[in-house]
Each structure stands twice: as structure tokens, then as C-alpha cells.
Amino acid sequence: MTTAESPATRDTAIFDLIRQEAERQRSGLELIASENFTSAAVREAQGSVLTNKYAEGYPGKRWYGGCEIVDQVEQLAIDRVKELFGAAWANVQPHSGSSANLAVYNALIEPGDTVLGMDLSHGGHLTHGNPVNFSGLRYKIVGYQVNPETELIDMNVVRRLAHEHRPKMIIAGASAYSRSIDFAAFREIADEVGAILFADIAHIAGLIAAGEHPNALPHAHVVASTTHKTLRGPRGGIILSNDLELGAKIDRAVFPGYQGGPLEHVIAAKAVAFGEALRPEFKDYARQVIRNAQALAIAFQQRGYRVVSGGTDNHLLVLDLRAQGLNGTKATKRLDANHITISKSTLPYDTEKILHGGGIRLGTPAVTTRGMTEEHMQVIADLIDRALKGEDVQAEVHDFAGRFPLP
């Protein structure tokens, strides 16, 4: 490559696709609850020369030389995330939320042990025991469900199942549950049966960091999370605990247990995101995320849609589309055609095939990052409603989205 030749002109195929993706993000409405937009600083750190450095091990205990700088980078990420969540110990090396969960399982329980987690169709996650996932293949899984009338987690049912099955681990956490989680109640039940309480806060980590959702750490033995979603960081995982002995076991499970060299450029980006989340303005952001989700839920109810559990306490809501004669797959296609991105969702006690889902999950982290507030949720609900009814609203979506710049 000559000094005058840029990477974009050398590999036009990839960089043209990157430009197309940037335009897709700019001109559309991103309502996938697990997606967000990072700051330019996060992207710059992730695209830095740190990607060149191999650093098996942990700060001060590496297998390779030349790690004195990345040691400081990783330690800064550790220190910041501990401050953010009030943790005594942290591991910032997991490549994803699922790999963080895998490390927790491998470190703390044995194959064949019983795990009590939220049923996927009721709002849980694949790694909480779904039979197609490692968690469902390696462990004996007992699923708890929401109350059929309130669609809230019924702690009396959780307690009954815990005493009946005596799990080694109880998982508190979800990927499509719109209400606050009572971590204190989960810990009380875990103590009654001698179980480890594992909190998966991947979706609500940013809300917890901002003080807008109860913190899991005073109650859970171990906490894992992604670093994107409501935290607005790069795609990756973290594990936290106030128990240093458990932390040491998990460190060994991450390395050398199942990962080799950590991605220090991603860890640097995590550190930047943690620093941003420690600023006062992040609290304002998290508060607005929730306000927007609640406003969006009300806007859909006003248009005749049923919102699962009747509303939301966090960043997401689930719409039941059965009364509209739609399922998640059909709705996703109609909205995609209008540059509105969402994810299909299963519904509690639904008979629709899990591949299609009876509803859709909507989240407000990304649109809030772009500066949208409650008044704009009415516009979004109107655009979605009309698109679901078969209208072409693509031009309106582009015009509306163009008013809100990406970070």
C-alpha cells in the first residue's frame, strides 16, 4: 500500500459495505433492545493498534513479553467496571455475554447439576438452559415461568421449584422481560436451598450502573453481562463478584479454561465505555431510556396493541401481535421493508412456533442515544403501526431518522 493509498481504496468491497451499513444505521430506526450506538471514542479504541498485541494471562501475569501497556489498559477497565457496579472483583476478558455465562457455569457447577432459570418463551435467554444451547445440553434444567395472569415472575413459584428440585445454581435475569427483577428475593430463595445465585444483567446493566434498576451485586454471588446494549460499549462480556474466591475460580475458567489471548483492543473500548457510564450525564441517558420505553408502551396501547405485562420498568417492551393476525416473523419482514429494525419474540404460554414467535420485542436504548424523547415515541409507534398494516412508510422513516444524528 502506498502512502497515498487509503485502506478504503485498497479493499473497496469491504469498505463499500461498511459505508452501506453506516447509511443503513443513519437512515433507519433501530429498535432492537440488545443494540445501541457506541461513541466515536469507543470505536476509536476498538480500532486501535492494541489489536496487534497478544496477551495471554492477566495484568502482571502474562505469557508474552511487551504487555506493560496492555496491562495498564486492562487494569483500567477492571478498576472502572468495579467502581461502576460496586464490585470487589471483575473479569473483563470474555468475548461475549454467552462466553461470560459459559465461564460462570464451568467455574462454579459440574455437568449434570441442576440449574433453575427462566424459560426462554417467558423471557429468558438461550444460555439459561435452552436445550439447543450448551447450558441445556450439559446441565439438568428446570425452568420457571411468569404468572399467566400478570405475566410477572412469581417468586412463590420460583421458591416452590427451588425447594422441589434443589438446584446448584439459580439464574436471575432475562432477555425479554420488561419488569424489574427482585434480586433480593432470589437470593433469599437461593440461601434456603444452598444454591449459587447467578444474575445475568446483560440487558439492564446500563440501567443498574445509572441507579435506575436495583443492583444485583449486593445479592448475587456472581453477575455477568454484555458490554453493549444499555451500557453503550463494544460487543463483549464482563463478570463481577464480591466473593474473591469465586472470582479466582472464574478467572481460571476464562483463562486458561476456554479462552486464550484476550482482545485488548476491545477491552480498551470497554474501558472507554465504563468511563462514559461513570459520568453524570449517563444517569440522564438511562433515565430517558426508561421514559421512552414507557411512552412507547402507552403509545401502542392507545393504538389497540396488547403490551405483555401491561407495560415496562426498563428499556424494552414486548407486543402481542396475535390480535392483529401477525406473528414475529411476518412483523419483522414488514418493518424491515420500511427500515425499522426490531426482533421477533416468543410470548408466555403462546402456541406459536418458537421460530416465528407471537410478538415482537422493542427497545429504546439506540433511539435514545440519538436524542429522541417521549414525544418522538408517538411518531415511532405511528410509523410501526402503519407499516404493520401494510403501508409504505419508508420515506417518512428516512426523513424522521435523519433529524437525529448518530454519535
From Swiss-Prot:
InterPro entries with a match to the protein in the record: PyrdxlP-dep_Trfase, PyrdxlP-dep_Trfase_major, PyrdxlP-dep_Trfase_small, Ser_HO-MeTrfase, Ser_HO-MeTrfase-like, Ser_HO-MeTrfase_PLP_BS, SHMT-like_dom
Catalytic reactions of this protein: (6R)-5,10-methylene-5,6,7,8-tetrahydrofolate + glycine + H2O = (6S)-5,6,7,8-tetrahydrofolate + L-serine
Enzyme class, broadest EC rank: transferase
Cofactor annotation: pyridoxal 5'-phosphate
GO CC term, one of those recorded: cytosol
Single biological process term from Gene Ontology: tetrahydrofolate interconversion
Gene3D superfamilies, alphabetized: Aspartate Aminotransferase, domain 1, Type I PLP-dependent aspartate aminotransferase-like (Major domain)
SUPFAM superfamilies recorded: PLP-dependent transferases
Keyword Nucleus: no
Function field: Catalyzes the reversible interconversion of serine and glycine with tetrahydrofolate (THF) serving as the one-carbon carrier. This reaction serves as the major source of one-carbon groups required for the biosynthesis of purines, thymidylate, methionine, and other important biomolecules. Also exhibits THF-independent aldolase activity toward beta-hydroxyamino acids, producing glycine and aldehydes, via a retro-aldol mechanism.
Record-stated family: Belongs to the SHMT family.
Protein name: Serine hydroxymethyltransferase
Protein species of origin: Deinococcus deserti (strain DSM 17065 / CIP 109153 / LMG 22923 / VCD115)
Gene: glyA
